[in-house]
A protein has these predicted regions:
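Carbohydrate-recognition beta-sandwich/jelly-roll modules
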Residues: 2-243, 247-304, 325, 348-350, ...
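Aromatic-lined carbohydrate-binding/catalytic grooves of carbohydrate-active enzymes
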Residues: 204-488
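Substrate-engagement module of ASCE P-loop NTPases
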Residues: 373-384, 493-507
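Catalytic core of carbohydrate-active enzymes
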Residues: 563-565, 571-582, 593-596, 601, ...
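Eukaryotic intrinsically disordered and solvent-exposed regulatory patches
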Residues: 118, 194-198, 217, 228-232, ...
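Flexible loop/turn segments at secondary-structure boundaries
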Residues: 217-221, 250-254, 399-405, 476-480, ...
Length: 844
């Protein structure tokens, strides 16, 4: 949970004092909190030290550090001392527990984490990033957080006989240790190498709608297609305010190819994962763009079917290659037919590229030096044509490209480093990206040149109109650290260079972190970075072939995002990733994005848009009715399994400016299989689920401005999907619901205000938007009136126990409808000149 604003209301419920006895005690082989045993059979080599004995100073803002110090008696550090030869990887028990519910986050791939629950130390998964123990005896929770000490990072692992194990590793056989004073923390901590979200500014894109090119084009992205994509959104009345040109724009090639020429005809992700960057500028597809060529009345034609045809052919090649690989595994020795078919398909794909290229420039090398060519000309033309497009981001890997930087092609000292995967990742899911990266190694720029590396890349991008980057494949560094002082020291060097460049070239905020869900990144890389992905990639279908994956994968994605936000949201703005608006479960995704508290963006293919759905998420000017916090699971979901326990509905809560919101989602039907070590469908759980929602499910004390809303005597509650309006109090019964598979309900809770003659009033907002309450911009009451500013156009709803005498809309009288059940409605226009904001006054 997010830390309470008032330290006196901490989860331990003890008053602040500098002399309070520590809540934890380690003695006689037992680790206890306020007298309640948590771990038994704690080895004698395990130590516990109070927070104040380890953390004596900090570069955090003084009020924050003082706040932490004031409750430091609620925390401390666990360590251990091995009486053996120092090692680069040490495993030690912290004790055992059984019969106590826990929630944890573990890495199921190198880069991605998700939720797991159980009730013993042996129930944990490998590479657990933290574990939250339920302690109902004191109506509280205890967090055990593996951290970083010196040159070692740590993670929790399952042990035998209910033991909870901690693993400390350096990532280099040259970096060894045998003892640690602070390798895990109990409760909360600030370590000087990162900053909390409250200390940083988020990028402007968090309040806006955007488009990412990935699912539309994959690696075949090109200027004409990007242009048409933005145009389709604008013509449809939903203007993107930011866009991400994903993988496919860079100058990359394979080791077997000419070191100074781009690889050609790449389409699907996977083929590029052994390729390396050979220059920091854009590839020829963008490099040859001539300024103004798409601005004229007769731009070059572009076949909107082309991307899907290319993707379809590339998928056929991929399937043929998989068939060949299966034949090899089954003992087939004559592969000539397979190879012949693969070659035939590749030739066909190459012919399709040659016959469908759109000329948007002269193609002459001499033109590339001119100011009106290349990425700069393209971004200028985009912003000239599409006035609302504020930001253009581009993708790159942390090491440059998937395969890093090709040695000898730039001024930097790059060396191809073989990849070494930690034993802790042996239990993770098979991942094509890992397979390909291990196959090719990484062209690593020497960490001494990390500053120069990012400055060279980002300063160029900034000059050509790029305002931010999506940095992907972040956790490859842990594969490469043997010769560079270990994973901690290598990461520090790279994150220092990245943060420095972010501050200089992208206003300090223009970076989305992705494939970064490991504690190395959060403890070492977030001093400047303020937004990052909290879920795995949006998969529109199961890449492993389960046809039902088109449905069950979507609930899995939602669980990733909701539970990862519990810790990631303390440090970065959670980004719930893109989705496709014409997907079979697009509405399911849209409901979660509406209240997630982060940016809303899609990866629609050309012609693949559901504008009716998008209009429920996005205002015509490309802004969004964003919640004021980041969405988190409700307390009654913490120790449950909303994916395949066949009974739990996921509930997430958030705040709007004048109310709270709860989203209830039926995510059942899939999840992690610890034996098969993969995420798969659980079809027997893909059923209707029942649950309940209560106003107290919202953690009103988590934001200072929301505290008074949580003290209301009564609330108007609007159910967006069923269009119901009901009243509720903190003491009333819960609202019961039943949700079909992959469906949801959004509950808006608005405090009721008592006006003259005991009239009760509460504005719900625009009901044609998923986050109705987010449309309310301001609210002022007098004894006889309610004055409301509403952004957007459509159906306005309020609860009013009495009929208003009159209503004024933007200074003029207007009609409205009122019914005895309290529904007060009228239609609002979108007024462009007023940024879509209408002023409503109800007089009583």
């Amino acid at each position: 949970m997010a830390p309470p604003n008032d330290p006196t209301n901490s989860i331990f419920g003890v008053p602040e004092t500098d002399t309070k006895k520590n809540s934890f005690d380690l003695s006689h082989g037992k680790f206890s909190v306020k007298g309640v045993p948590l771990l038994s059979e704690v080895p004698s080599n395990v130590s516990f030290k109070p927070f104040s004995s380890i953390c004596k100073s900090s570069d955090a803002p003084l009020p924050l550090f003082q706040r932490v110090q004031s409750t430091s008696f609620n925390g401390g550090f666990l360590g251990f001392n091995k009486e053996e030869e120092p090692s680069d990887r040490l495993m030690n028990s912290l004790g055992k527990f059984n019969g106590r519910d826990f929630l944890s986050i573990f890495r199921f791939k190198t880069w991605w984490s998700t939720q797991w629950v159980g009730n013993s130390g042996s129930d944990l998964q490998m590479e657990t990033q933290w574990v939250l123990l339920d302690v109902p005896e004191i109506r509280s929770y205890v967090l055990i957080l593996p951290t970083i000490e010196g040159k070692f990072r740590s993670a929790l692992h399952p042990g035998t006989d209910d033991h909870l194990m901690i693993c400390a590793e350096s990532g280099s056989t040259q970096v060894k240790a045998s003892s640690f004073d602070a390798i895990a923390y109990v409760h909360v901590v600030h370590l000087n190498t990162f900053k909390l979200l409250e200390e940083k500014s988020a990028p402007p894109i968090v309040d806006k709608f955007g488009w990412c090119t990935w699912d539309a084009f994959y690696l075949s992205v090109e200027p004409a297609g990007v242009w048409l994509g933005v145009k389709e959104f604008t013509d449809g009345g939903v203007s993107p305010r930011f866009m991400i040109i994903d993988d496919g724009w860079q100058s990359i090639n394979l080791d077997s190819q000419d070191p100074h020429k781009d690889a050609k005809n790449l389409v699907l992700g996977g083929t590029q994962m052994t390729a390396r960057l050979h220059r920091f500028e854009e590839c020829d597809k963008f490099r040859n763009y001539k300024g103004g060529s798409l601005l004229g009345p007769n731009p070059p034609p572009f076949d909107t079917k082309k991307p899907k045809v290319l993707i379809s052919k590339a998928i056929a090649i991929e399937q043929a290659e998989k068939a060949r690989d299966r034949a090899v595994q089954s003992g087939v020795t004559d592969l000539s037919q397979f190879e012949s078919e693969i070659e035939r398909l590749k030739q066909k794909l190459n012919q399709m590229f040659c016959g469908n290229e759109v000329e948007v420039g002269c193609g002459s090398c001499c033109c590339k030096a001119e100011a009106n060519y290349g990425m700069k000309a393209f971004t200028n033309d985009l912003k000239t044509k599409f006035k609302g497009l504020d930001d253009v981001y581009v993708w790159h890997a942390l090491c440059g490209a998937w395969g890093g930087v090709r040695p000898g092609t730039t001024h930097l000292n790059s060396k191809v480093i073989p990849c070494k995967v930690s034993p802790g990742l042996d239990g993770t899911m098979t991942d094509l990206a890992v397979v390909k990266i291990i196959e090719g190694g990484i062209g690593l720029v020497h960490p001494d040149q990390a500053d120069d590396f990012y400055e060279s890349m980002h300063s160029y991008l900034s000059k050509v109109g790029i305002s931010g980057v999506k940095v992907d494949v972040i956790h490859t560094l842990e594969y490469l650290s043997e010769e560079y002082g270990g994973r901690v020291e290598l990461a520090k060097a790279y994150y220092k260079g990245l943060s420095k460049s972010l501050s200089k070239n992208f206003n300090g905020t223009g970076l989305i972190a992705s494939m970064q869900q490991c504690n190395d990144f959060f403890f070492l890389g977030t001093e400047q970075i303020s937004i990052g992905r909290v879920g795995d990639d949006f998969w529109f279908q199961d890449p492993n072939g389960d046809p039902n994956g088109v449905y069950w994968l979507q609930g899995v994605h939602m669980i990733h995002c909701a539970y990862n936000s519990m810790w990631m949201g303390q440090i970065i703005q959670p980004d719930w990733d893109m989705f496709q608006s014409d997907h079979l479960c697009a509405k399911f995704h849209a409901g979660s994005r509406a209240i997630c508290g982060g940016p809303v963006y899609v990866s629609d293919s050309l012609g693949g848009h559901d504008f009716d759905l998008l209009n429920k998420l996005v205002f015509p000017d490309g802004t969004i009715p964003k919640c004021h916090h980041f969405a988190l699971p409700t307390r009654d979901c913490l120790f449950k399994n909303p994916l395949f326990d066949n009974k739990t509905v996921l509930k997430i809560w958030n705040f709007n400016k004048y109310g709270g919101v709860i989203g209830a989602f039926n995510c059942q039907g899939a999840g992690w299989d610890s034996k098969e070590q993969r995420i798969k469908g659980y079809s027997h759980c893909y059923n209707p689920m029942s649950g309940s929602v209560h106003v107290t499910d919202i953690e009103w004390d988590q934001k200072l401005q929301a505290t008074t809303m949580g003290e209301a005597e009564e609330y108007a509650v609007y159910l967006n999907q069923s269009e119901k309006l009901v009243l509720a109090t903190p003491n009333s019964d819960s609202i019961h619901i039943t949700l079909k598979p992959s469906s949801f309900e959004i509950f808006s809770f608005v405090p009721i205000k008592k006006l003259v003659l005991a009239t009760k009033f509460a504005p719900i907002g625009l009901t044609n938007m998923f986050n109705s309450g987010g449309t309310i911009q301001s609210l002022d009451y007098s004894a006889t009136s309610a004055k409301i500013e509403v952004k957007g156009g459509g159906n306005f709803l309020a609860f009013s126990s009495g009929k208003p005498k009159k209503c004024c809309l933007n200074g003029g009288d207007v009609g409205f409808e009122w019914s005895a059940d309290g529904r007060l409605t009228l239609n609002l226009p979108w007024i462009e000149e007023a940024a879509g904001i209408s002023e409503l006054i109800f007089l009583f």
